């Protein structure tokens, strides 16, 4: 297992759509393991492959506070969603930045697991939000895209200052 470098906002990989995973092989399994290690070491609850520079449609998630319920989702998709709610969220690609995002409270998502089996998951609340956030990454959409212009511009301005200071 190896810890991977998380791409920060401004990296072109975050704005490119990921391609479907066509084969689940040892490379994908090892990458999933590395992504989980990276996510846990960064105190995250989700990590999408584009966030580590891999433009493939898969992500890892674990919203369990004890970090004992990892989910590896290959080619995930939202099947349905209901009851939108607004809540604060952040992102490992935006360390230290947060914003209120409107997402479905309840969703059904489909994905392929590491054994090649098609799965469906009914998710609520925090897990539902995390799934939507990670699947957005696969479509090159970031949480700041949901924010009002003034908030997004404020975050971008602060990031620009951090880059100038060498802190990004």
Curated annotation (Swiss-Prot):
Residues reported to bind Fe cation: 91, 133, 137
Domain of life: Bacteria
InterPro entries named among the record's database cross-references: Peptide_deformylase, Peptide_deformylase_sf
SUPFAM superfamilies assigned to the protein according to its UniProt record, in alphabetical order: Peptide deformylase (SSF56420)
GO MF entries: metal ion binding; peptide deformylase activity
Biological processes, Gene Ontology terms: co-translational protein modification; translation
Reactions catalysed according to its record: N-terminal N-formyl-L-methionyl-[peptide] + H2O = N-terminal L-methionyl-[peptide] + formate
Cofactor note: Binds 1 Fe(2+) ion.
Active site location: 134
UniProt cross-references to Pfam families, sorted A to Z: Pep_deformylase
Cofactors demanded by this protein: Fe(2+)
UniProt entry keywords in alphabetical sequence: Hydrolase, Iron, Metal-binding, Protein biosynthesis
E.C. designation(s): 3.5.1.88
Family as reported in the entry's similarity comment: Belongs to the polypeptide deformylase family.
Job of this protein: Removes the formyl group from the N-terminal Met of newly synthesized proteins. Requires at least a dipeptide for an efficient rate of reaction. N-terminal L-methionine is a prerequisite for activity but the enzyme has broad specificity at other positions.
Protein name, per record: Peptide deformylase
Lineage: Bacteria, Pseudomonadati, Elusimicrobiota, Endomicrobiia, Endomicrobiales
Gene behind the chain: def
């Amino acid at each position: 297992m190896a810890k991977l470098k998380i791409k920060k906002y401004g990296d072109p990989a975050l704005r490119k759509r990921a391609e479907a995973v066509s084969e689940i092989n040892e490379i994908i399994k090892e990458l999933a393991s590395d992504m989980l290690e990276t996510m846990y070491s960064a105190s995250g609850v989700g990590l999408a492959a584009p966030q580590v520079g891999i433009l493939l449609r898969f992500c890892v998630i674990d919203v369990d506070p004890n970090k004992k319920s990892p989910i590896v989702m290959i080619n995930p998709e939202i099947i349905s969603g209901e009851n939108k709610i607004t809540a604060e969220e952040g992102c490992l690609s935006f360390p230290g930045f947060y914003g209120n995002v409107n997402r479905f409270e309840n969703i059904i998502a489909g994905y392929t697991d590491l054994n090649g089996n098609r799965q469906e998951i009914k998710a609520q609340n925090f897990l539902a939000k995390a799934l939507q956030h990670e699947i957005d990454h696969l479509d090159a959409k970031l949480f700041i895209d949901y924010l009002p212009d003034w908030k997004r511009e404020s975050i971008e301005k602060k990031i620009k200052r951090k880059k100038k200071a060498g802190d990004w």
